[in-house]
């Protein structure tokens, strides 16, 4: 059997580990949006300023979670851009995400003057108009899951309450960021509800609140009742996810069919009116009518027997009288009696 030397096996294992770690560290691409406000030509000043902007943003991603920059001196060729990384990721993950976004945005939007690219870990945008400290009511990117929780009404109410608290916490803080893990246990369904909200730091408090509320309202259209929801705009991020800690319980069995109607009743049972009448009639028959009928039958039998006896006796006496007949003689004065007995 072929086997590798020990040092080669260790090297292969190390390379495999690094490859898996690298693949797992790759940012998750969501969507790109190319605005229709205008295009630039490849060799224009706008293109040159755009390249400078992207280079600066990429270089700052190693130590900053948010950065904005403007490249150019002429109002017609100046490019404004910024990026935002999620507050719960490491600086290396942020750097990887912005580096990937700065390259791929030109693949999806090769000539547009304004574009935005979203990853789950970050987003990057640029424009020919001023975008700093301005709430953009532009497009949203939404992601959701197909699966739901067993008790949706309770889940929806819990999500709404917890996300509202997170939004208040985020726009009230200096970082415009808030996250939490809320443990839920309801009728055997146990899960952790992880929530995260974040705004770009250049917004004021009111605009941060408006952005996050608009993002949450988007979840009611795309993700209502779903275990996972993600809504990003060009100024804020909002996401939540329910992670089950135990398999959800099976749905309760359907109720058993109703028992068939009972025909026998105890002392305290109350039958229906028709059945009660029949039941009472049977009791009356057994207690009163049946003995009366039996007595009548006995009397009739005795009467018939007595009548038969009387008839037999009368018939017998009649036969005896007919048998005793007087026969007169012709010549003598004596009577002859004939007895047939």
UniProtKB/Swiss-Prot annotation:
Organism, scientific name: Arabidopsis thaliana
Keywords on record: Disulfide bond, Repeat, Secreted, Signal
Signal peptide: 1-25
Keyword Membrane recorded: no
Extent of Pro residues compositional bias: 247-262
PANTHER family in alphabetical order: CYSTEINE-RICH REPEAT SECRETORY PROTEIN, CYSTEINE-RICH REPEAT SECRETORY PROTEIN 1
Disulfide topology: 85-94, 97-122, 199-208, 211-236
Protein name: Cysteine-rich repeat secretory protein 1
Highest classification ranks of the organism: Eukaryota, Viridiplantae, Streptophyta, Embryophyta, Tracheophyta
Chief place where the protein resides: secreted
Family: Belongs to the cysteine-rich repeat secretory protein family.
Highest taxon, organism lineage: Eukaryota
GO cellular component: extracellular region
Positions of the Gnk2-homologous domain: 28-131, 136-245
Region listing for Disordered, in residue ranges: 247-274
Pfam families: CR_prot_dom_plant, Stress-antifung
């Amino acid at each position: 059997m072929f086997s590798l030397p020990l040092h080669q096996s260790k090297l292969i294992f190390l390379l495999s580990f690094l490859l898996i770690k690298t693949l797992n560290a790759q940012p998750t691409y969501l969507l790109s949006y190319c605005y229709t406000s205008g295009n630039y030509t490849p060799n224009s000043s706008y293109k040159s300023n755009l390249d400078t902007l992207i280079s600066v943003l990429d270089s700052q991603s190693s130590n900053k979670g948010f950065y904005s920059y403007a490249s150019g001196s002429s109002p017609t060729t100046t490019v404004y851009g910024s990026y935002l990384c999620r507050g719960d990721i490491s600086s290396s993950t942020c750097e990887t995400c912005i580096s990937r976004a700065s390259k791929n945005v030109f693949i999806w939007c090769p000539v547009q003057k304004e574009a935005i690219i979203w990853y789950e870990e970050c987003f990057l945008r640029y424009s020919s108009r001023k975008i700093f400290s301005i709430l953009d009511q532009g497009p949203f990117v939404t992601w959701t899951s197909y699966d739901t929780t067993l008790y949706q009404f309770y889940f929806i109410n819990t999500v709404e309450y917890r996300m509202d608290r997170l939004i208040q916490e985020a726009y009230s803080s200096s970082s415009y960021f808030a996250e939490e893990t809320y443990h839920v246990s309801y009728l055997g369904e146990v899960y952790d509800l992880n929530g995260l909200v974040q705004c770009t730091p250049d917004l004021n408090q009111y605009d941060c609140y408006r952005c996050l509320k608009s993002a949450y309202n988007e979840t009611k259209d795309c993700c209502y009742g779903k275990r996972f929801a993600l809504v990003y705009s060009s100024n804020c991020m909002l996401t939540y996810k329910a992670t089950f800690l135990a398999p959800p319980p099976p749905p309760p069995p359907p109720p058993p069919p109703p028992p068939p109607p009972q025909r026998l009743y105890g002392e305290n049972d109350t039958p229906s009116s028709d059945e009660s009448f029949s039941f009472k009639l049977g009791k009356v028959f057994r207690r009163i009518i049946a003995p009366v009928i039996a007595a009548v039958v006995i009397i009739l039998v005795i009467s018939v027997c007595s009548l038969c006896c009387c008839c037999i006796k009368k018939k017998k006496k009649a036969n005896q009288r007919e048998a005793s007949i007087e026969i007169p003689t012709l010549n003598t004065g004596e009577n002859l009696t004939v007895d047939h007995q």
